[in-house]
């Protein structure tokens, strides 16, 4: 049985490799922004959500910069289940649910991604493994849900996105 080292940065070689690969994939523009936090899975109203946390484990907010940190600090922290990015400062995100099936991008998702008018910064597979995040250059404005039979959300501020660093190759 492996013993967890409470002050270790990584608990296994696989964890170290994932962190290194994520750092290589996440664009420098996002890594340099002090808009990072941790998140944990939590139940709310019978639904699993991703609750934002500070690197110390306190509640964080997607609208309170005092609860955000650097990419390096968020990546080093072992609090919760992963890292998240607070949208804003010209960085927005399209969140496409159920866009992947067995690792294959659905035709509707590919068509939508190819039609995105804003410059794309970074594309990744979401935490569920079935969704897609498309980080974009965007001016701040209200979020919106694009239905068209699919669940597509676009946010530019006031939200955070759980970041996996698992690059989506189109």
Residues of each region from the PLM?
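BZIP DNA-binding basic region
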Residues: 1-22
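Conserved phosphate/metal-binding and DNA-contacting active-site motifs used
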Residues: 22-170
């Amino acid at each position: 049985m492996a013993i967890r080292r409470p002050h270790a940065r990584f608990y296994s070689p696989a964890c170290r490799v994932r962190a290194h690969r994520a750092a290589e994939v996440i664009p420098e523009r996002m890594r340099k922004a002090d808009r990072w936090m941790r998140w944990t899975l939590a139940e709310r109203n019978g639904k699993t959500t991703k609750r934002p946390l500070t690197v110390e484990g306190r509640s964080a907010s997607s609208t309170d910069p005092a609860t955000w940190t650097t990419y390096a600090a968020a990546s080093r922290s072992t609090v919760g289940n992963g890292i998240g990015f607070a949208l804003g400062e010209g960085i927005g995100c399209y969140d496409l649910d159920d866009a992947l099936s067995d690792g294959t991008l659905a035709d509707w998702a590919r068509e939508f991604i190819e039609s995105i008018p804003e410059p794309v910064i970074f594309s990744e597979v979401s935490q569920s493994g079935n969704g897609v995040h498309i980080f974009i250059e965007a001016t701040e404005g209200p979020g919106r849900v694009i239905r068209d039979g699919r669940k597509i959300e676009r946010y530019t501020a006031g939200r955070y996105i759980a970041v996996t660093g698992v690059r989506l190759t189109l």
